[in-house]
Swiss-Prot record:
This is SsrA-binding protein. Belongs to the SmpB family. It is found in: Cytoplasm. One of its GO terms (biological process) is trans-translation. Keywords: Cytoplasm, RNA-binding. Pfam families: SmpB (PF01668). It comes from Pasteurella multocida (strain Pm70). One of its GO terms (cellular component) is cytosol.
């Protein structure tokens, strides 16, 4: 019996760290992406950015808007490579209906959280989010600073 090969490295292509700072993430979901060949090659080279991207709905379908995938220099010359084109998300009808309803009725925003490989497929983790106010962001910063201070105090108490 042959052993499975252990993969070295990470499966993450791009992260949207700003999303967790600007929004309360209520729910997360995984979606596939409809990509062109040059986009897959660029993503394998790590040329993707989803920091300012979000999900829009058009004609009952969900699309990733604002994501940038820079084409490689060796990309095909007979295809026009648009780095900021809107890309269709591959979701089940039930998931689409749920997201659409919450975004329209309840005032949620749907943001892209991370882009990663799952096997040979590129997947996008999307989050159902509510916007944070300025005071919420300040509270998060205070909590983070208090945690660091508390850990420092506990470490000094253990050592001395």
């Amino acid at each position: 019996m042959t052993k499975k090969k252990v993969k070295v490295g990470t499966n993450t292509i791009a992260l949207n760290k700003r999303a967790r700072h600007d929004y309360f993430i209520e729910d997360e979901m995984e979606a596939g992406l409809e990509l062109q060949g040059w986009e897959v090659k660029s993503m394998r080279a790590g040329k993707a950015n989803i920091s300012d991207s979000y999900i829009i709905f058009k004609q009952g379908e969900a699309y990733l808007f604002g994501a940038t995938i820079q084409p490689l220099n060796v990309a095909s010359t007979h295809i026009v490579c648009d780095p900021t084109r809107t890309r269709k998300l591959l979701l089940k009808q039930k998931e689409l209906a749920s997201l659409f309803g919450k975004a329209n009725r309840d005032g949620y925003t749907i943001v892209a959280l991370s882009l990663y490989w799952k096997g040979a497929w590129a997947k996008l983790k999307i989050g159902l989010a509510k916007g944070k106010k300025q005071h919420d962001k300040r509270e998060d910063i205070k909590e983070r600073e208090w945690k660091v201070t508390k850990d420092r105090i506990m470490k000094n108490a253990r050592l001395g």
